[in-house]
């Protein structure tokens, strides 16, 4: 009787166990009552699914603790998302150790303190050795564990926005403590001081400390070698000129001001040291320019094997593409970034096939089988902006899926479920292929996310499919790219970086191998039987560098307030040697 009751109360667990699923999403109506009946914790049976890689429990006001057994029962967990619940005021140590965990999202809870992690002593292994993204935003944290850096030494993104922190632990900025940390967000806290040791964060690209209680910004911040974006708005700084600069100037200007010692360049020894540092940087820049901008035959040889990524700023673009985000998508799949890429050549040989294969590989690896993020590519000529990213009930969402007829999302999902069952019967195994593998990511959602163009047509239904309307073909040279995620904005940017750099590699490969172009009849009709004029193609020259143009796309709310722009100065920062990013 007891087992029957559990199966009836938690059918998702029975299904996940039967189908040997790697991902599980618990949300939607009825979840709160079941968790309350389980004592405010997750059911113990959940921790008997050792194959789980992704677990999300969100929007449950009765969930106060994960429950004992999580670490022991889910050793292969890669992503743990427990956002918008009622976790707190403390968090029991049973959350770790989790040796494979890469993403931990505890945002929107009621946490006031975190348990100390493992790794205090040199002989103790870190509790979260593979963790890359930690989201603690929207809690009530007053302090961070002193050993956070030792617990998660591979951390790349740390979001502490909207807490009650008045300081960072000194260990966080210890030399070599977090060598990979590229994003630190701690806006809307009570921070009073920023340690000069922040300069030890060698990989830091973006820093958001807006709306705190800082009175000074350490000059050492300018020594962060990769820092591209900073936000100190809403702090009452003693240096009023600097306070005015952080409200309106670009990051480069602010760092330059800090680098020379503030107003007047400082005095005495400080000024001399600042001048020496600046002179050293100037010489390095000149050496780099000489290497990159040589003349004569040496430059010609270098150009032939180089590919330029030209970033077109929104202000330079007469018709920039914009994505508006409606509020209801926040509870479904809140994060999206977009970009426009011009200058691809998919006509030669297997170029299109390689392009589509690269997307599949990204979905499998970096996107963690679409659980962390989902990317979509569109024929730009068929995209009519501005675009709207929203969420709709399944019965109201209509799309023409790739290779299928128009259908409502509810009907499409049902059809895919039937096809999945048929696959299992034919192959006599539980695993399925294609789009059928991602259906469980919609479990429990009352609304489905979608991207809608200016004509009102749905061109994307993440994480399931794109629309036939914007299908990429061999004739496609200009593309609109989108990446969405239910996990974090940073993973969207990471996937977009990887996709664009992969496109650059493919462009270089196509040019070097000089494959012959080919068009199918259908594709030839699409361009009226005419191939593009090589003289108008910026990459057609044999002697100069090939060019891809990446246009910035702004994501705004319905009032027009900016949410994110891609690519920003901090994006595309890890380009390979043969790719030069021109901003």
UniProtKB/Swiss-Prot annotation:
Skewed-composition ranges (Basic and acidic residues): 270-281
Has UniProt tagged this entry with the keyword Ligase? no
What does the record give under GO molecular function? phenylalanine-tRNA ligase activity; RNA binding
**GO biological process terms on file:** phenylalanyl-tRNA aminoacylation
Disordered: annotated segments? 260-300, 513-544
Pfam families membership: LRR_4 (PF12799), LRR_8 (PF13855)
Which superkingdom is the protein from?
Eukaryota
The residues bearing each LRR repeat, given as ranges, are 76-95, 100-121, 130-152, 154-175, 180-202, 203-225, 226-246
Q: Which residues carry this modification: Phosphotyrosine?
A: 509
Which keywords accompany this UniProt record? Acetylation, Coiled coil, Leucine-rich repeat, Phosphoprotein, Repeat
Keyword check for Coiled coil: yes
Q: Which InterPro entries match?
A: B3/B4_tRNA-bd, Leu-rich_rpt, Leu-rich_rpt_4, Leu-rich_rpt_typical-subtyp, LRR_dom_sf, Phe-tRNA-ligase_IIc_bsu, Phe-tRNA_synthase-like_B3/B4
Identify residues that carry N-acetylalanine.
2
List the coiled-coil residues: 402-437
| Protein name according to UniProt | Leucine-rich repeat-containing protein 47
The protein's organism comes out as Homo sapiens (Human)
In the UniProt record, the gene name given for this protein reads LRRC47
